[in-house]
Amino acid sequence: MAKELKFSEDARSAMLKGVDQLADTVKSTLGPKGRNVVLEQSYGSPTITNDGVTIAKAIELDDHFENMGAKLVSEVASKTNDIAGDGTTTATVLTQSIVNEGMKNVTAGANPVGIRRGIEEATKTAVDSLHAMAHEVKTQEDIAQIASVSSASEETGKLIAEAMEKVGHDGVITIEESRGVDTSLDVVEGMQFDRGYLSQYMVTDNDKMEADLDNPYILITDKKISNIQDILPLLQSIVEQGKPLLIIADDISGEALPTLVLNKMRGTFNVVAVKAPGFGDRRKEQLQDIAILTGGTVITDDLGLELKDTTIDQLGQANKVTVTKDNTTIVEGAGSKDAISERVEFIRNQIGETTSDFDKEKLQERLAKLAGGVAVVRVGAATETELKERKYRIEDALNATRAAVEEGFVAGGGTALINVIKDVAALKETGDVQTGINIVKRALEEPVRQIAENAGLEGSVIVEKMKEQKPGVGFNAATDEWVDMIKAGIVDPTKVTRSALQNAASVSALLLTTEAVVAEKPEENAPAAPAAPNPGMGGMM
């Protein structure tokens, strides 16, 4: 395939057109009075959204050079979304401003490498200032405010705050589609894993088809149980105690399973058997998690332990266990809080060290199960289009809230970015480096300017007036009032704001230092070949 090349000014201006087309589409959604964008789908109804990264990913331009510019901005939005989960529109607005101002200066003869140094220096100063002014998330009200601003819904804010309160900051909160029009919250207390009972004859509630065990002992092993004699001494001890038993094993087969079922049906003792969750090394780690949660010991060859020698002291315990055909839920395990805390910290360290996204996801699931359980937000809406839009908003709100828990929050509505301008302005360099600093100074005004313009006001007037206010006082575009943003509950997670700025500065600096662009040469449309006569149809009229 032949390639087409563009150099210097031609290359940069072509990419700039793509940057502007994507950014102009995305930035119309910024702020409380931002508009929606309708996205065509290959099938089904169109999607209506104001989610920056969703819009950015949907844009594909005909011109290869312009499309590369658009894709670089889309990359800024995606990376910000990956790191912080929100702030994608802000990142896009910042990128457009830095690129446009930078291009003007490079065209006028400035050295792009010097400009890049200035951009990097100013960005570092701005990020340090954001961290210095950040407030820690302390109350449920703080969480509700952050989620409300991100989703533009007080109801959603309260729902996410309630979910976080129930499962903890490290708990898993999943978002699913509801069959009704209402949005609700369900919480699975304790640890749940996706393994159900091995025989339906083990159920205790025939209506719900589930087995409930109150204050059970829990045998945890990575061995296969095929001979009932291996666990007979243990079963006799449990019968004497009069307590139910949950068996978590690699498998239960041979004579062991029917013997357990028969004794259960006779009323000798109450027992439920399930297979161990996970596979391979992950199975061993998950069994260890369950053991620590319940205060038991994993019966494994790795520790030199045999099933026939197992004692009641080596079993785990819990307040309640519920087993369905698909899942096992352990509520209020008897493990020590110190041991659980140590295990949580160990898994957190593993998350920080792993480079695999898949491993990280599995570790986070394990962390959540140990640290607080699982909350399910079931999103309801009247139509499929509204449902998609509401899901996007709730996902953004959830991500923003988690980001705020990590790094705190700052005044929202672009106010924090205006407040850090004075620290950036204090930087004194010379030549093109100073030009780069000035470009970032100008870009820091852009989110406020755009929020005001989307609200039908003159952006530059609002920006200048905000610079005269005390730090933290900003413009509430929803009510057209000047307020203390934090007291008014208009806040942004520090992680979201700083990620947007860092990613925008990084990609913009790369764009400005681009000297050549290589793209696929468009294929010329070949003339259509004349239709060949069909020999099998000769003579037919």
UniProtKB/Swiss-Prot annotation:
A Pfam family this chain is assigned to: Cpn60_TCP1
Subcellular location: Cytoplasm
Keyword annotations from UniProtKB, A to Z: ATP-binding, Chaperone, Cytoplasm, Isomerase, Nucleotide-binding
GO BP term (any one): protein refolding
EC class name: isomerase
Biased composition (Low complexity): 525-535
Catalytic activity: ATP + H2O + a folded polypeptide = ADP + phosphate + an unfolded polypeptide
Gene Ontology, cellular component aspect: cytoplasm
Region (Disordered) location: 521-541
Source organism, top-level taxon: Bacteria
Entry GO MF terms: ATP binding; ATP-dependent protein folding chaperone; isomerase activity; unfolded protein binding
UniProt: ATP binding residues: T29, L30, G31, P32, D86, G87, T88, T89, T90, G413, N476, A477, A478, D492
EC nos: 5.6.1.7
Protein purpose: Together with its co-chaperonin GroES, plays an essential role in assisting protein folding. The GroEL-GroES system forms a nano-cage that allows encapsulation of the non-native substrate proteins and provides a physical environment optimized to promote and accelerate protein folding.
Assembly: Forms a cylinder of 14 subunits composed of two heptameric rings stacked back-to-back. Interacts with the co-chaperonin GroES.
Xref: HAMAP family: CH60
Family that this chain belongs to: Belongs to the chaperonin (HSP60) family.
Protein name (database record): Chaperonin GroEL
Biological source species: Lactiplantibacillus plantarum (strain ATCC BAA-793 / NCIMB 8826 / WCFS1)
